[in-house]
Design a protein with these regions (language model features):
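Amphipathic protein-protein interaction modules
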Residues: 86-166, 170-173
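Non-Sec secretion/translocation targeting segments of pathogen effectors
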Residues: 216-218
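Polar/charged low-complexity regulatory segments
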Residues: 11, 26-28, 32-34, 42, ...
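Residue-level detector of alpha-helical secondary structure
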Residues: 82, 132-135, 168, 172-179, ...
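N-terminal low-complexity, intrinsically disordered segments
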Residues: 6-94, 98, 102-107
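Extended, Lys/Arg-enriched charged tracts that mediate electrostatic binding to polyanionic substrates
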Residues: 209
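Metal- and O2-centered redox machinery and metal/ROS homeostasis
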Residues: 206
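Compositionally biased, low-complexity intrinsically disordered regions
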Residues: 2-4
Length: 218
């Protein structure tokens, strides 16, 4: 179920150069998934909680969506992923180098915008929901909904190349659809007027850049 796969916070404007600013938006935190795993005493290795995060990060590395600061610090990891992904376990990298979190500052401007569209709001399309859909197809409805998984079936998906390639195709389709929205790059971040309006409304707001097709918000 959707609520079992999510740890999201509302979008907040990032001021200044997205790659130089220390402010960042949280996307996912493994502690949430590990907490569920431990509370339900699931018989799996806690490293499985990083699986879906590692898939997303690898795809972004392979598609040049990482930010300048990240490349300066971890460029060798990106090169390893591109050269020999099968022998580069990004789960341990996320655990040891990223403290179990994915956050917007890891990515360049396009990567941030796509993450906000696909990983930052509980609306379709939504990356955690796509992971959950894969679990449903992989295990089948009967087993997926059984007490065996206790609503955490995604944690039991084998972390192998088939899993990555299947999800990579899904992410690719989402990315192509997103690019097809024809965003005005000058509006990827809220303008001063947009920020003022959101502050005036004094409620949780979702900012959308100027786009040719309003399908994502319909």
């Amino acid at each position: 179920p959707e609520e079992q796969m999510t740890l999201k916070i509302g979008y907040e404007p990032i001021k200044g150069d997205p790659e130089d600013d220390d402010d960042s938006i949280g996307m996912d935190d493994v502690s949430y998934h590990i907490e569920n795993l431990e509370e339900k005493e699931l018989p799996i290795d806690p490293i499985n909680a990083y699986n879906h995060m590692a898939i997303y990060l690898r795809w972004c590395m392979e598609h040049d969506l990482m930010g300048g600061k990240f490349l300066a610090e971890h460029g060798e990891v990106v090169n390893q992923v591109k050269a020999d992904p099968g022998n580069t376990d990004l789960r341990t990298f996320i655990r040891e180098e990223l403290f179990g979190c994915l956050f917007s500052a890891l990515f360049n401007q396009k990567g941030r915008a796509f993450a906000h569209y696909y990983y930052g709001e509980i609306d379709a399309p939504y990356y955690p929901a796509d992971i959950d859909d894969y679990a449903l197809k992989y295990f089948g409805p009967s087993r997926y909904h059984s007490n065996e998984f206790q609503q955490e079936a995604y944690l039991f998906i084998p972390f192998d190349e088939k899993y990555y390639q299947t999800m990579a195709q899904v992410i690719e389709e989402r990315f192509e659809n997103w690019q097809g929205q024809d965003f005005d790059e000058d509006t990827l971040e809220p303008s001063e007027v947009a920020q003022a309006i959101m502050e005036y409304l004094d409620c949780e707001c979702t900012y959308f850049p100027s786009m040719a097709d309003d399908d994502p918000i319909m």
